[in-house]
């Protein structure tokens, strides 16, 4: 056979022969073109010359010669194309002709590997393993390169070609990082295109896993591994099943799992994820077990055992560890199985407290819970109650019990009533019962309870008390010969009394009395002798006695005398001694009812002398016999000392020439009157008799200059004394003094008219401002003089004095010298509108300067007057450029001198200058507005860098100029000068030209997706910087940056890929911007990222990617076969991020390329993927009812595969068996565990991919055993059993029951394998039968044989137990019966504080309401109810409530202080209060107070229901207060079981501590001060059931009741209550007579005394208003003036006589009433702004206090005062008209004071002045005033007044609202009165009617503007009208006087005072007219209209 080459040559030869041609031509050709690809070659050549024959032969090293078919392209060109060549191979081409052969060598391109990928199995955290299949064709080597995510080359390698398998591993990489790998095939000098794949290193696992465990949660912590991490995934597995999972970011180092099962073991996996790969670490973790619940330790009444029960906690429990300990010492410890829930401890100590700890153990963890329990205590032994001989006492003794106890509780019973309940310490073995209110002689029962914790055990015994003696044995009365005793009967049993009286050791009387006797009188006794009286109580053979000592009253002395023996300071007395027993004599010296001497004299003495007495005073000497502290009746005699003469006599002429006044110091002692005599030369000129209180007088019409003698005689009784003095009158003064300057500046002439009378000479003095200059003595015959060398312009005072002896008379005159003009008058400075002139001051005195400004001799301004020290003046607001004349006048008094000067103003500068470049780069235009005044022209100049560029002169009518040829962007200084003559005024401004724009702007992306580079050429002119703006294609600004003027480019980074941008450049110079230069540019679009395979199956591949950043237009997607052929392509929207290819071949590798397009730019990414082989089908498993075998079968897999792999898994994931084969369809597994679930995997393998099918099957389980029941409740119980052996598997148990009720089965352990269940929903009390089976499997279950058990439930508890108080001694309880079968209820009621059982009984099941009676008031009780059914008891249900508390029931009238059972002294009353007076039915009485009232004949039976009442200090310092209370003292009645026998001894007025103790004026508190002597008092006892809370804060509304007032009890008189009173009355009458005489003598004088009444608030008046006492006032000023109604009109006419003289005088007397009180709080700086007028302030004592805010001491202030009325001491509140800032305070006061009525008697605005702010809503919309909400409900407008109704409530108490009426009188002028009386009277009556219909309301608020004038008139009229309705007299003066004691200026004007009289007169007239005509006039004034008009003299003003 020929070779291929030889055959080709032969073929060519034969061809040539067949052509039959001659010798062929020679071929000349040249190679034109040659191309080569991987599998083809193309070659072309051209024939040069004539056509010829040729052939083309090609060959390679693996291929012999072959002919390449040629084809003709044109006449001279030929070619040959070869296909299906071997890649990478060198081919030799020969073009053969007959005479020439040309060789061409061509090589095909090599191909890359067909498959190139990353081997995940061999990839680690630091290495990446790549593999590829050999390329087809020839390859000499492969070049493999590794790139990071940013396509930066990391590593590269050249690997020689291998025929089988090619691979390479990159080391030292970063864990968790993505890499791109490129491979290129190299063959000779050619390289294939690169093939890419990507891969990732495995992330590093976490390190140092830490576990923090709790019962329901696990806290996992870890440390980061090396390399990159994207996230951590945590998985908590339970037997291969995911229980919980979570994903956290790469920075996290901890994670918490919640909701876990306590005590459970989990498999924890912490997985690190990065670059699509994972790595993990795992660890076994366990949650902490939970502690048991409902742990209870009970003793069941046992002394020596305890029972412990608990409920199993949820979760897993392995066992329980129970320990019993006492005080930290473990007594016993036990380990119990987890299904046990109770245990018992025995042989314990009685009464001991044990600690029981139950630990739940799960694995290595445990949870503890502790409870305590106590054994029942033992009883005491040998209990006895004995009498110790003491009254009201028993001694209880006993022997201690066995075991432990804490204390004893001792109860004392009187029958069934508990008298004593007390606790004593455990170390005690006896207790003495004292002060427990035991009744003597009575038998009691004692119970001793041993208490240990809350457990008790008791023992009882009986005992009896000793009888009691009588109580409060005292001497009731004693006189000179008799002694009466009285006592109170004790609470005891007795038969009679034995009465005895003894004198020292001698028994005088011994007598038996009946048991009802309470007093006895002993007679025929010796005066002043001491006796012992004894009362003995006899009861059977027992007795007890009580004794009291008493003394008879001693006898009085006789024949008492007193004398002064002519001395001024001594008295002498003597007497005859008294009969009977006398210890001493008490001698008192009394002066003006005050004891000034108190001496005790021996009984043997009968005389005494008094020294150092007051002269002229009348004294009373009292001698009293005293024996044993008892005084006899007093004997009184009077005597007087001689009066003293006066001293300090002063005679004064008072500067008068016809008058002398005489004054002296009052003579010491007492004086009746003085006689003053004036004499001259021994002749009496005048004589006056002066009252003793006056110490001065005067004499007039005397001769000037004469010497007089004054004699003052002191008289007292029949005695007198004398004093002398002399004095002279003042001489007369001159007349008509004249002073003249004669037009000279240094000269004055003085002249006068001669003085009358006698004088020595004249003295003339000239002075200036009290500085003497000259004094001249002038003979009495001359009448003028001259003064020279004086100061110019000075005012001089000239005094002409008449001299006569030591006295003189002055007359003054004034004169002034002429002033001089100013000096150095100069124009100092000038401006456009100012002239500044200065000068030097004129010589001499100058009063002021007057300066004038003239223009053309006309005054420009009015003259200006300057002080005399002024030396300059500036004229302003002048006209610029104008000439002015300035004139300066020197003025001294009424004379003046002048000087002047002339000057000009500066022309004004231009204004409103505006410079603008007008958008040009080379010019500036300036314009301006001319200034004021005249100007000739303007000069405009431009400067650049201080160099003048241009300057122009502009006519005065031109106001604009433009500068040209300037530089762009440059700053210029422009100067504009106003020119006026030689003066200029210029202004400099700055302007800048517009900068030029840059040129040649270009934007380039430099192949970047995130940046653009902008470049430009520099702008012309001056530039500071370039502002470069980056905008969107639509012109939206994205960035704004600046570059220095020297920069020519800028790079924008962090841009959006594929986005088109606009760029603008502005040149900036001095804040000006050039025109923008603009260009456009686009960034390269970004390729997609995170391109990945999301799903691959046997027939399709799904890809997903992350969208390209930035903007893009669309995606092109290509899918290539392994040979590079396109399989499929698609174009998708930019929003698409996934794509799938369907109907692919199984197991094939594909390449997917995605290209991103944006505009004209693009970018791409690619990835490889393979399909999955098919799996088997119909895989099934079956156990065939066996417990140890499983059978599986299936159908074969379709498609290609290599083999099957069978894997059987245990439940824990471990492999049980593993088999491999290709032709299997069934398999059996044997030797398996019963009940266990197995999983079979059948895996189909094909290449590196596989597919599997799984099936599950389970063996049958084993049955349970040993069923039991626990925790049996009413609707639930626990069932436990023993499960199958531990080595078997099972999942659950199935529980069934009969009857088939709808029950709920709960697994409390959260583990289905737990050997117990809790069943809910049971019918209480029902019997059930249960069976249990073992269950294996969840969906397909197998069951074991059942086991059975029966049980019955408890009855249910009651529902909605509600107990509420019925009254103070009963409560009611109701409930809903349980839905259960039951027999009845067991009910107990206990006291909460003592736990004593007060009530216990069984109740039928049909009842659900119970009343419990006979309880203690105001005690909290606990009611417990249990349901009972067939020996089963439900849970106890408890509720507590408190019995009611209320005011104590008012005692009956006979229960009060008995005036017969009191002991009385001059300052105290001793009486007894008994607990039985007040019942505790409505609650225990907690406190008492004593209410004391002066008896005044009123019919009030009980105290006013007001709290608190005034204190003792208020009562003593305010005469209008008649009632006071003592301090509160605690009641101990509730502590005494027999409280009716408890009594309190009260000594009122003795500074008793319990009543408040001694009074301290510095402390405002309740106290117990001494009572007034000889004063009748009525006493009431006030008892409180509620007064203070637990923090001793007083309740706002305490609960109390009062006894009836006692009958009047009169205190004893002072010792001089007999004769002294008579003498005092006589002296009082004499004094009054002397006062009347003195008043007639000095009737024109105003008394110097001023009242100082106390301003305490009055208690409710009980006396008629016509009766006023002068207590608390000095002098004899009246406080009331009651007028009988039938005499009123005549009285009013008398007051109106002589132009209202008497009425004005009466009103004037009220001027200073109350003004002595302090207003310190109102004057504080913080409070001044709260006063409308600074002279109308509230007194501190009567002001209204608001509640404090935020501890601000001034926040309680408001200008308001309490005012008393006829009914209450705080009947009104008077306030000012609210200010804008005090409206909130006003409404706060209304709210806090419980105000229901407001009276307003002013308009808000009067005569244009605001009198009161509008402080209420204008409409019916609600408004806030502070925290209060006010709403107007209605408004009734009448002609003269308006009535509004408001609703007010607190912001936090919207339901607790109050209605308030607002009475607004609208026709009353300020400081005046209404036109008629009818209008106001009717208004007052209307308001009073509303007030009377508002019971329980607080004070009525009344206000005008200041709150004194109209307000006072309204209140006074209201009180007066009430008097007219209820009394026969009216007291207007007293009403106003009372008002002014509480607020200043009440009834402010006299016309208002008269108006009140007119109102009374008109009311009385109308009443009389109504009576006559029987036509009702009041209150509606119908039919009759009398003239209710004011008198004309009091018209409005």
Swiss-Prot record:
Pfam families: fn3, PTP_tm, Y_phosphatase
Major subcellular location class: membrane
Induction: Up-regulated by hypoxia.
All copies of domain Tyrosine-protein phosphatase, residue ranges: 1703-1963
Extracellular side: 23-1621
Superkingdom, taxonomy of origin: Eukaryota
Signal peptide start and end residues: 1-22
Gene Ontology terms: biological process: angiogenesis; dephosphorylation; glial cell migration; osteoblast differentiation; phosphate-containing compound metabolic process; protein dephosphorylation
Cytoplasmic side: 1643-1997
Membrane topology summary: Single-pass type I membrane protein
Active-site feature positions: 1904
InterPro entries (UniProt xref): FN3_dom, FN3_sf, Ig-like_fold, Prot-tyrosine_phosphatase-like, PTP_cat, PTPRJ_TM, RTP_Phos/Ushers, Tyr_Pase_AS
Catalytic reaction(s) noted: O-phospho-L-tyrosyl-[protein] + H2O = L-tyrosyl-[protein] + phosphate
One term under GO cellular component: plasma membrane
GO MF annotations in UniProt: cadherin binding; transmembrane receptor protein tyrosine phosphatase activity
Domain Fibronectin type-III, first and last residues per copy: 23-111, 112-207, 203-288, 291-378, 379-471, 467-552, 556-641, 642-729, 730-829, 819-906, 909-1001, 995-1083, 1087-1175, 1173-1260, 1260-1356, 1357-1448, 1458-1554
Family, similarity comment: Belongs to the protein-tyrosine phosphatase family. Receptor class 3 subfamily.
Protein name as annotated: Receptor-type tyrosine-protein phosphatase beta
High-level lineage: Eukaryota, Metazoa, Chordata, Craniata, Vertebrata
């Amino acid at each position: 056979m020929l070779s291929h080459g030889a055959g080709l040559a032969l073929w060519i030869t034969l061809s040539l022969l067949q052509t039959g041609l001659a010798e062929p031509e020679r071929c000349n050709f040249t190679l034109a073109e040659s191309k080569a690809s991987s599998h083809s070659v193309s070659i072309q050549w051209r024939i040069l010359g004539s056509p010829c024959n040729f052939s083309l032969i090609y060959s390679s090293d693996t291929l012999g010669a072959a002919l390449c078919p040629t084809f003709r392209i044109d006449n001279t060109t030929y070619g040959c194309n070869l296909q299906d060549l071997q890649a990478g191979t060198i081919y030799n081409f020969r073009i053969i002709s007959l005479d020439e052969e040309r060789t061409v060598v061509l090589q095909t391109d090599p191909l890359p590997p067909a498959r190139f990928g990353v081997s995940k199995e061999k990839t680690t955290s630091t290495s990446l393993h790549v593999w590829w299949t050999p390329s087809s064709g020839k390859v000499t080597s492969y070049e493999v390169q590794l790139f990071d995510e940013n396509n930066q080359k990391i590593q590269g390698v050249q690997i020689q070609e291998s025929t089988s398998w090619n691979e390479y591993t990159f080391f030292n990489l970063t864990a968790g990082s993505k890499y791109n790998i490129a491979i290129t095939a190299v063959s000779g000098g050619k390289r294939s295109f690169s093939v890419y794949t990507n891969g990732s290193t495995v992330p590093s696992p976490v390190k140092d896993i830490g576990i923090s465990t709790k019962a329901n949660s696990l806290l996992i912590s870890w440390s980061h591994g090396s390399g990159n991490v994207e996230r951590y995934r945590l998985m908590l597995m339970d037997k291969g099943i995911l229980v919980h999972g979570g994903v956290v970011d790469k920075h996290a180092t901890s994670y918490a799992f919640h909701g876990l099962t306590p005590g459970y073991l989990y498999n924890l996996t912490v997985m690190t994820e990065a670059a699509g790969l994972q790595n993990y670490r795992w660890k076994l973790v366990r949650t902490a077990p939970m502690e048991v619940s409902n742990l209870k330790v009970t003793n069941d009444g046992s002394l020596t055992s305890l029972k412990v029960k608990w409920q199993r906690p949820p979760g897993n429990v392995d066992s329980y560890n129970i320990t019993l300990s006492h005080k930290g010492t473990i007594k016993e410890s036990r380990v119990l199985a987890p299904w046990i829930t109770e245990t018992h401890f025995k042989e314990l100590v009685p009464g001991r407290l044990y600690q029981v700890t139950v630990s739940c153990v799960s694995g290595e963890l445990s949870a503890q819970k502790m409870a305590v329990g106590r054994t029942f205590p033992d009883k005491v032994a040998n209990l006895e109650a004995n009498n110790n001989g003491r009254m009201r006492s028993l001694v209880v003794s006993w022997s201690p019990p066995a075991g432990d106890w804490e204390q004893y509780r001792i109860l004392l019973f009187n029958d069934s009533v508990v008298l004593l309940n007390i606790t004593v310490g455990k170390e005690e073995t006896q207790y003495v019962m004292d002060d427990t209110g035991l009744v003597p002689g009575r038998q009691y029962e004692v119970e001793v309870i041993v208490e240990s914790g809350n457990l008790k055990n008791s023992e009882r015994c009986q005992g009896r008390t000793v009888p009691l003696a009588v109580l409060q044995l005292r001497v009731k009365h004693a006189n000179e010969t008799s002694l009466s005793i009285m006592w109170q009967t004790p609470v005891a049993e007795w038969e009679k009394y034995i009465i005895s009286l003894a004198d020292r050791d001698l028994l005088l009387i011994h007598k038996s009395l009946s048991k009802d006797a309470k007093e006895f009188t002993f007679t025929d006794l010796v005066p002043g002798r001491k006796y012992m009286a004894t009362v003995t109580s006899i009861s059977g053979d027992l007795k007890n006695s009580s004794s009291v000592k008493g003394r008879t009253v001693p006898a009085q002395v006789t024949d008492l005398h007193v004398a002064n023996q002519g001395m001024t300071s001594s008295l002498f007395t003597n007497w005859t001694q008294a009969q009977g027993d006398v210890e001493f004599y008490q001698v008192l010296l009394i002066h003006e009812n005050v004891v000034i001497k108190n001496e005790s004299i021996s009984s043997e003495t009968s005389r005494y002398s008094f020294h150092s007495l007051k002269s002229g005073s009348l004294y009373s000497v009292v001698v009293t016999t005293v024996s044993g502290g008892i005084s006899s009746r007093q004997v009184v005699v009077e005597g007087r000392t001689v009066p003293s003469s006066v001293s300090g006599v002063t005679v004064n002429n008072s500067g008068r020439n016809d008058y002398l006044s005489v004054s002296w110091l009052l003579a010491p002692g007492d004086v009746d009157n003085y006689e003053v005599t004036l004499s001259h030369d021994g002749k009496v000129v005048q004589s006056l008799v002066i009252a003793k209180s006056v110490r001065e007088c005067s004499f007039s019409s005397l001769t000037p200059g004469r010497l007089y003698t004054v004699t003052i005689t002191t008289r007292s009784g029949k005695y007198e004394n004398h004093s002398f003095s002399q004095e002279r009158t003042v001489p007369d003064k001159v007349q008509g003094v004249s002073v003249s300057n004669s037009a000279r500046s240094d000269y004055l002439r003085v002249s006068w008219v001669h003085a009358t009378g006698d004088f020595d000479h004249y003295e003339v003095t000239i002075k200036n401002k009290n500085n003497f200059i000259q004094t001249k003595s002038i003979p009495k015959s001359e009448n003028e003089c001259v003064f020279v060398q004086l100061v110019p312009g000075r005012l001089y005072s000239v005094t002409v004095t008449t001299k006569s002896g030591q006295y003189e008379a002055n007359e003054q005159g004034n004169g002034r010298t002429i002033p001089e003009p100013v000096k150095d008058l100069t124009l100092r400075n000038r401006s456009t509108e100012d002239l500044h002139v200065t000068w030097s001051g004129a010589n001499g005195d100058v009063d002021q300067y007057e300066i004038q400004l003239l223009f053309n001799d006309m005054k420009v301004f009015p003259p200006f007057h300057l002080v005399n020290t002024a030396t300059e003046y500036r004229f302003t607001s002048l006209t610029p450029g104008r000439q002015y004349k300035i004139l300066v006048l020197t003025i001294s008094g009424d004379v003046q001198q002048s000087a002047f000067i002339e000057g000009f103003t500066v022309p004004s500068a231009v204004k409103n200058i505006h410079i603008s470049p007008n958008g040009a780069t080379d010019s500036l235009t300036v314009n301006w507005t001319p200034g004021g005044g005249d100007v000739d022209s303007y000069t405009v100049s431009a400067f650049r860098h201080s160099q003048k560029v241009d300057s122009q002169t502009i006519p005065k009518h031109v106001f604009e100029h433009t500068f040209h040829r300037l530089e762009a962007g440059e700053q210029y200084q422009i100067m504009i000068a106003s020119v006026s003559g030689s003066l200029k005024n210029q202004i400099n401004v700055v302007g800048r030209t517009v900068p030029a724009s840059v040129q040649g702007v270009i934007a380039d992306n430099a192949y970047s997706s995130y940046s653009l580079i902008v470049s430009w050429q520099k702008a012309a002119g001056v530039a500071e910087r370039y502002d470069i703006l980056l905008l969107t294609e639509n012109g939206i600004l994205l960035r704004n940056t600046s570059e220095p003027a020297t920069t020519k480019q800028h790079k924008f980074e962090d841009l959006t890929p594929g986005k088109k941008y606009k760029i603008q450049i502005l040149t900036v110079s001095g804040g000006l911007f050039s025109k923008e230069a603009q260009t456009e540019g686009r960034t390269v679009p970004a390729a997609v990222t995170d391109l990945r395979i999301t799903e691959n199956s046997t027939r399709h591949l799904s890809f997903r990617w992350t969208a390209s950043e930035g903007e893009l237009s669309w995606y092109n997607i290509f899918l290539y076969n392994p040979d590079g052929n396109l399989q499929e392509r698609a174009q998708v929207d930019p929003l698409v991020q996934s794509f799938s290819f369907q109907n692919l071949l199984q197991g094939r590798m594909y390449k997917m390329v995605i290209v991103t397009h944006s505009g004209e730019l693009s970018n791409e990414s690619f990835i490889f993927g393979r399909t999955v082989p098919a799996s088997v089908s119909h895989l099934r498993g079956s156990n065939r009812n066996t417990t140890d075998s499983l059978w599986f079968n299936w159908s074969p897999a379709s498609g290609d595969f290599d083999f099957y792999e069978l894997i059987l898994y245990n439940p824990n994931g471990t492999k049980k068996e593993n088999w491999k084969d290709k032709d299997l369809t069934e398999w059996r597994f044997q030797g398996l565990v019963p009940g266990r679930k197995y999983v079979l995997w059948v895996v189909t393998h094909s290449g590196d991919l596989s597919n599997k099918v799984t099936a599950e099957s389970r063996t049958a389980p084993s049955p349970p055993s040993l069923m039991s029941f626990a925790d049996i409740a009413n609707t639930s119980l626990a069932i436990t059993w023993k499960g199958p052996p531990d080595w078997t598997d099972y999942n659950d148990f199935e529980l069934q029951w009969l009857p088939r009720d709808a029950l709920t089965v709960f697994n409390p352990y959260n583990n289905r394998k737990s050997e117990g269940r809790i069943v809910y929903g049971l019918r209480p009390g029902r019997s059930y039968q249960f069976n249990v089976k073992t269950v294996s499997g969840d969906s397909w279950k197998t069951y074991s044989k059942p086991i059975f058990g029966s049980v019955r439930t408890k009855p249910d508890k009651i529902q909605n137990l509600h107990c509420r108080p019925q009254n103070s001694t009963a409560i009611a309880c109701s409930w809903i019966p349980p839905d259960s079968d039951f027999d009845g209820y067991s009910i107990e009621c206990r006291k909460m504080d003592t736990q004593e059982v007060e009530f216990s009984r069984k109740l039928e099941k049909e009842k659900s309401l119970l009343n419990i009676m006979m309880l203690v008031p105001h005690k909290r009780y606990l009611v417990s109810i249990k349901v009972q059914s067939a020996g089963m008891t439900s849970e106890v249900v408890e509720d507590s409530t408190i019995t009611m508390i209320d005011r104590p029931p008012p005692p009956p009238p006979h229960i009060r202080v008995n005036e017969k059972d009191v002991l009385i002294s001059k300052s105290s009353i001793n009486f007894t209060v008994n607990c039985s007076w007040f019942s505790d039915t409505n609650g225990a009485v907690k406190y008492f107070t004593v209410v004391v009232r002066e008896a005044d004949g009123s019919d009030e039976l009980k105290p006013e229901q007001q709290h608190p009442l005034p204190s003792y200090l208020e009562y003593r310092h305010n005469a209008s207060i008649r009632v006071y209370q003592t301090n509160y003292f605690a009641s101990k009645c509730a502590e005494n079981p027999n409280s009716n026998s408890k009594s309190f001894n009260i000594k009122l007025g003795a500074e008793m501590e319990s009543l408040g103790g001694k009074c301290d004026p510095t402390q405002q508190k309740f106290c117990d001060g001494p009572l007034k002597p000889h004063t009748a008092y009525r006493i009431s006892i006030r008892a409180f059931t509620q007064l203070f809370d637990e923090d001793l804060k007083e309740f706002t509304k305490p609960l109390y009741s009062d006894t009836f007032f006692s009958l009047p009890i009169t205190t004893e008189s002072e010792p001089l209550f007999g004769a002294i009173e008579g003498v005092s009355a006589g002296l009082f009458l004499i004094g009054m007579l002397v006062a009347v005489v003195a008043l007639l003598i000095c009737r024109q004088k105003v008394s110097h005394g001023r009242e100082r009444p106390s301003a305490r608030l009055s208690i409710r008046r009980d006396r008629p208003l016509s009766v006023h006492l002068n207590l608390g006032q000095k002098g004899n000023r009246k406080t009331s003036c009651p007028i009988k109604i039938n005499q009123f009109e005549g009285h009013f006419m008398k007051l109106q006589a002589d132009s209202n003289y008497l009425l004005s005088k009466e009103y004037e007397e009220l001027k200073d009433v109350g003004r002595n009180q302090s207003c310190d709080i109102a004057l504080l700086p913080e409070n001044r702004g709260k006063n409308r007028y600074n002279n109308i302030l509230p007194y501190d004592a009567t002001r209204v206090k608001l509640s404090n805010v935020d501890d601000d001491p001034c926040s309680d202030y408001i200008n308001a005062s309490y005012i008393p009325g006829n009914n209450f001491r705080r009947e009104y509140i008077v306030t000012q008209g609210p200010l804008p800032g005090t409206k909130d305070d006003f409404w706060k006061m209304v709210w806090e004071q419980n105000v229901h009525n407001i009276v307003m008697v002013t308009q808000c605005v009067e005569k244009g002045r605001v009198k009161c702010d509008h402080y209420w809503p204008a409409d019916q919309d609600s408004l806030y005033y502070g925290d209060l909400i006010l709403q107007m409900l209605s408004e009734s407008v009448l002609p003269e007044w308006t009535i509004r109704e408001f609703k007010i409530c607190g912001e936090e108490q919207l339901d607790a609202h109050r209605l308030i009426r607002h009475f607004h009188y609208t026709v009353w002028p300020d400081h005046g009165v209404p036109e008629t009386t009818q209008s106001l009277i009717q208004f007052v009556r209307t308001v009073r009617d509303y007030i009377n219909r508002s019971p329980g309301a607080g004070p009525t608020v009344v206000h005008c503007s200041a709150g004194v004038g109209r307000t006072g008139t309204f209140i006074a009229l209201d009180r007066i009208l009430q008097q007219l309705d209820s009394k026969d007299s009216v007291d207007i003066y007293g009403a106003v006087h009372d008002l002014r004691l509480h607020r200043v200026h009440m009834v402010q004007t006299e016309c208002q005072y008269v108006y009140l009289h007119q109102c009374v007169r008109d009311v009385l007239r109308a009443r009389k007219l109504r009576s006559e005509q029987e036509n009702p006039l009041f209150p509606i004034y119908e039919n009759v209209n009398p003239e209710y008009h004011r008198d004309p003299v009091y018209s409005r003003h």
